């Protein structure tokens, strides 16, 4: 039996209060609201490169990471700290963004 990748195990849980799937990052202000929402509650994870139905599409460029970084720096006060990890799953890259509980607000 093939062992499940940790990201596949997260995806299998489906989206919930602490887990959100994003096909892509196209709007820094919108992502800032998501970062802020996670930070102001119990924290959470964003999986970038995963469609709402759980299918892995993969991230298309380094730009995804930089848009998240820009969202935190430009649109949240104080800046929301996050950790990002790139995972290779079946030849596609998924960007996992972990946001810990942290009181802030989005602009």
List where the protein language model places each region.
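Conserved N-terminal catalytic/coupling substructures associated with nucleotide/phosphate chemistry
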Residues: 1-107
């Amino acid at each position: 039996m093939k062992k499940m990748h940790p990201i596949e195990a997260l995806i299998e849980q489906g989206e919930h209060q602490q887990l959100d799937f994003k096909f892509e990052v196209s709007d820094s202000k919108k992502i800032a609201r998501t970062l802020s929402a996670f930070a102001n509650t119990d924290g959470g994870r964003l999986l970038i490169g995963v469609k709402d139905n759980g299918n892995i599409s993969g991230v298309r460029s380094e730009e995804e990471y930089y848009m998240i970084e820009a969202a935190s720096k430009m649109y949240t006060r104080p800046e929301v700290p996050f950790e990002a990890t790139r995972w290779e799953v079946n030849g596609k890259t998924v960007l996992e963004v972990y946001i810990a509980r942290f009181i802030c607000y989005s602009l």
